[in-house]
Amino acid sequence: NKAVWDAFLQYKIERQHLSQKEEKELRSFIEEKRYIEWSARLRDTGERLPLPIRREINKGGTSKKRIIYSYPPEMNQMLKIIAYCLYEYDSVFSKNCYAFRREYGVKDAIHRIRTTGGIAQKYCLKVDIHNYFNSIDVQILLEKLSFLKGGNEELYGLFERLLTADEALVKVEDGRYENVQEKRGAMAGIPVSPFFANVYLKDTDAYFEKRGILYFRYSDDILIFADTKEQLQEYRDILYEKIRDCRLERNPDKVMVCEPGQMWEFLGFCYRDGKVDLADHTIRKMKHKMKRKAEALRRWQRKKGLSGDKAAKGFIKAMNYKFFAREEGTEFTWCRWFFPNITTDKGLKELDAYMQQCIRYCVTGRYYKGNYRIRYEQMKEWGYRNLVAEYYKGMITKDREK
């Protein structure tokens, strides 16, 4: 249905989800009606589906890697339109599930947290599920997807074929791709995996919602509040049992229990004294990225015998991309995630100050007082974007739109 494709394209453009290249490719795919052939291929249960490519990408701010999957471009376009249309099933999810939903997400979670009376006086449990997407049990997931059979047997059949292939392509040293047999779970990185992730724990979400328990889930991050320590332990035991029943594992290093009045973190934010700011971990992780990039560019500048401003400009360009562009394999944009939801600029000021130190280091190769001869105005001329200024610029724009 071309009208659906046109609506999908407009939706993506309005939300600035597409680069110029991506928009051009999608327009071409629609105008040439390549979706007609692909629709027939996906409906043909006798046709073997393309295999996804398995890749490892850096896990922000650490030496760890995370595994993502991606299908060939045209197959990926088909999965994107399917993901877009899956929003018709949004009503099956509880209101305490905030991930990957249209016009409902992290800002609503933060608003609920901020407007819940007495939340600072409650006990809090933060739980993270280890390798959530790729460790999802496919047979359990297919059972949970069975509600699709009533109205869309073909869609269920396609998902069954996607999920049970247990095979992927991996690039080897000489540039070739080899087949590997493996359990892929919901395949993090493919367009429909967020829907699978929401479905997989929807019964757990519904359990806590039905009982009026203050519970928040965003994908693999879960936050629960209780009035007493004993009550929190009861909720914890129930949650852990449900996680085990789904054959998932908790990440023990990321479990956090907070008593009333203590600061707690969720989704990269921290809540302290009624204010929402960048979490300490978010700040540390970003500083680590800045330091590594500055040192790498300084080494490159010296090796090439270039002037210091070349390294500084390279660093600024990299940071602008990090803060204001989409993250690889996702539609995540750092500034769009954090700026609308924080209520103080304290964390941004800390990052700005550190970023300016790194820019000056790129020029001189040292961290010392003499670096201040490199003026703020000079950094602006090189393209530096002050985070605090960008934050308030966004607030002004938002107020005008109201």
Locations of regions flagged by a protein language model:
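Conserved polymerase palm-domain catalytic core
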Residues: 116-219, 223-242, 248, 258, ...
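Non-catalytic, polymerase-adjacent accessory regions of viral genome-replication enzymes
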Residues: 1-37, 366-376, 380, 392-402
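Conserved pre-motif C helix in the palm subdomain of viral-like polymerases
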Residues: 63-94, 181-209
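Right-hand nucleic-acid polymerase module
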Residues: 76, 80, 177-181, 206, ...
